[in-house]
């Protein structure tokens, strides 16, 4: 059923009036241009850089590790916004937020929320605070200022932080690099920590949350943009193990 729903959602976007083919947008290329493009991609595929080699190695290691663990089969539901959301014409049942909470229900025991961009708004902050005050364990992980690639998002999130903490919500912020035990004189003097040489900083990109053994994994950030502007998709999986 989840696969059928995913296919149906894809086709609804593919066939929508707001979807355009590439030739409609940029015109058609010549046969010579197509041949050059094909040659470029073939050469690029053969020229693997160091990062791609590391990714391939990591994939092999992950595949090997996964074979050591049993597969936990569980019921899953594919949910998504309708293309009508873009026009402001979506019915309540065509909005992913309503679908999500219809399936997952109101948290009673616990809620773990991971969101790269976390801007709860007043309504969202009140919702999470009331859960925590009524005995539900609420934990949130989002990017720290240093890890966030959109500083203004952190600025909007920051104004809700104190209130959430005071109401019992547990907040965690992702660090872009691992702290060291020793710092240079410059870092001590300025408070600006320089990442280890050769290691780029990291940021949180995942979006998922768990409500009493039901897990959502998808593209939805806990922010107004995902709720009201973007069209988002995801899976709700009924699994205590997950």
Predicted regions: what they are:
Residues 1-242:
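Charged, low-complexity intrinsically disordered terminal segments
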